[in-house]
Curated annotation (Swiss-Prot):
The keyword Secreted applies. It comes from the Eukaryota. Its main location: secreted. Belongs to the colipase family. The lineage of its organism: Eukaryota, Metazoa, Chordata, Craniata, Vertebrata. GO terms for molecular function: enzyme activator activity. GO terms for biological process: digestion; lipid catabolic process. It comes from Gallus gallus. This is Colipase.
């Protein structure tokens, strides 16, 4: 299942998972974090 209410800096797959409602991809990497 998906994890919601993630703190800034935690890995995410979509913005809805983050407290800040923003899932940002790091440049040059496939990982995204809140």
């Amino acid at each position: 299942g998906l994890i919601f209410n993630l703190d800034t800096g935690e890995l995410c797959l979509q913005s809805a998972q983050c407290k800040s409602e923003c899932c940002q991809e790091d440049s040059g990497l496939s990982l995204a974090x809140c």
